[in-house]
Structures are given as structure tokens and as C-alpha cells.
Swiss-Prot record:
Gene name per UniProt: M
UniProt superkingdom: Viruses
Assembly and oligomerization: Homomultimer. Interacts with viral nucleocapsid; this interaction contributes to the virion assembly. Interacts with the viral envelope glycoprotein; this interaction contributes to the virion assembly. Interacts with host RAE1-NUP98 complex. Interacts with host NEDD4 and TSG101. Interacts with host dynamin. Interacts with host NDUFAF4; the interaction inhibits viral propagation and is independent of interferon activation. Interacts with host GTF2H5; the interaction may inhibit host transcription.
Chain segments carrying region Disordered: 11-36
Compartments (UniProt record): Virion; Host endomembrane system; Host nucleus membrane; Host nucleus
Short sequence motif PPXY motif: positions: 33-36
Compositional bias ranges of the Basic residues kind: 13-23
Gene Ontology CC terms: host cell cytoplasm; host cell nuclear membrane; membrane; viral envelope
Chain location of the short sequence motif dynamin binding per the record: 2-4
Protein name: Matrix protein
Family in the record: Belongs to the vesiculoviruses matrix protein family.
Xref: InterPro entries: Vesiculo_matrix, VSV_matrix_sf
Length: 229
């Protein structure tokens, strides 16, 4: 019986003979497996996926969208919110375990910046130590600047999210019904991010950050969604 060392030696000699016999052929041999970071296409095609999209995604730059939106927001919390940003921090739980359209998510977040700002407390809910309830309903058309790359077509249709949350200082339930879609209107529209509707520009940008958006102000006073986390 041959030893393991002898078997390995024979295997090496056989490999050398194969290399010599294949020398000058057009077939490709891997001397070593591809590196971990090397990007390869999947072995099977993905239906409906255009690989060319990945080539121009980073070069799209700043884009403009005209959106039609509507949002109905209902919130019940154990304790009253102390400020707008406190409300935003808690209402941000609306997207916990998000299962909606991924392409719409950044724009849902932008609408929520304004929807939370419009929330009003129900006076009846503040009596007799009951849990406070807040509601808001907003709708309109707006201009959105973004550098998020390719955005899929967005139909104006309703999605609904109901979530409960529990934090260090408060807990409750949030119910959101939201519509967002692209509109082809020729009207001049205001931006979705409007510091005049907030206490300050800093407050508005902080709210966007809490809701998972990175918003930057350009030299011509446009507010651009640069990232959605």
C-alpha cells in the first residue's frame, strides 16, 4: 500500500503533465480561486433585473422628482411628547420591520417629517390621566431633490403600517396610512423640506436624520436627500 506522501507526489507529477499537455491551448485555467472581493455575476439570471443599471447608478447625480403625497397619522403614547423632535423620535418606529415598497421608503420618510410636525393632540385624551392621542392628515404635491440613484416608477397608492413601540421613556402605538406617487404636473411646486414650517432649519434637518435621511443643503438653497439609511 502506498503512503500518503507517495500519493501526493504522484498527484503533483500528474498535474505537471496536464499543464504541459494543455500549454498553448485557449482554455482558461484558474491557478487559484477568485478572491473574496471579486464581484461575479450570479450563475442563474434574475428575472427583470437589468445589470446595466448598476453601471450608471453612481453617475446619476442630483435628480428632481415631482411627487403627490397624502399621509394620515394616528399615534397613542403612554406619556405626552415633550417636543417635536421627541415626537419624531418615537413616531420613527412606524417603519420597524418595514415590509413596504423599498423604492418609496426614502420619500415616505420625507413626508413623515412634515406629517409629525402637523400632529395635534386630542383634548379628550389628555383628561383623567388617559394615554394621549395625536392625529394629523396632510396631502399635497411637492418637489424632491435627491442623489439616491435609480428610482423605480412609483404609483400613487396607499400603504398602511401599524406598529407598537417601547422605549426608555415612552411607549405606544403608531398607525400610518401613506400615499406617494410621481406626478407629471407642470406647476411650480415647493420643496418637501421647508424650514419655514419648522422652528428652525436645524430642527428640520435633525428630524430628517432621526427618520433615517441624510439631507444636505446646496448652494442654491435646495435640500437634497443624499442618503437613506
Amino acid at each position: 500500500m502506498k503512503s500518503i506522501r507517495q500519493l501526493l507526489s504522484l498527484a503533483k507529477k500528474e498535474k505537471k503533465r496536464e499543464k504541459k499537455s494543455n500549454h498553448g491551448s485557449h482554455s482558461m485555467e484558474w491557478e487559484s480561486p477568485p478572491s473574496y472581493n471579486e464581484i461575479k455575476s450570479p450563475s442563474a439570471p434574475i428575472f427583470g433585473y437589468d445589470y446595466e443599471d448598476m453601471e450608471y447608478l453612481p453617475t446619476l447625480g442630483v435628480q428632481t422628482l415631482k411627487l403627490q403625497y397624502k399621509c394620515v397619522l394616528q399615534v397613542r403614547s403612554e406619556s405626552p411628547f415633550t417636543s417635536y423632535l421627541d415626537a419624531v423620535d418615537n413616531v420613527a418606529n412606524w417603519e420597524k420591520q418595514y415590509n413596504g415598497f423599498s423604492g418609496k421608503k426614502p420619500f415616505y420618510r420625507a413626508v413623515m417629517v412634515r406629517a409629525v410636525q402637523a400632529m395635534k393632540a386630542n383634548p379628550m385624551s389628555l383628561q383623567d390621566g388617559r394615554s394621549p392621542e395625536y392625529t394629523s392628515e396632510i396631502e399635497g404635491r411637492c418637489l424632491v431633490f435627491h442623489s439616491l440613484g435609480h428610482i423605480p416608477p412609483m404609483m400613487y397608492m396607499c400603504e398602511q403600517f401599524t406598529r407598537d413601540w417601547s422605549g426608555r421613556r415612552n411607549q405606544g402605538i403608531v398607525n400610518v396610512k401613506i400615499w406617494v406617487g410621481v406626478t407629471d404636473t407642470l406647476d411650480n411646486l415647493d420643496q418637501i423640506f421647508d424650514p419655514k414650517k419648522h422652528f428652525s432649519e436645524e430642527e428640520m434637518l435633525s428630524a430628517a436624520t432621526i427618520l433615517g435621511l441624510e439631507v444636505k443643503k446646496s448652494s442654491d438653497n435646495n435640500y437634497i436627500i443624499s442618503k437613506s439609511y
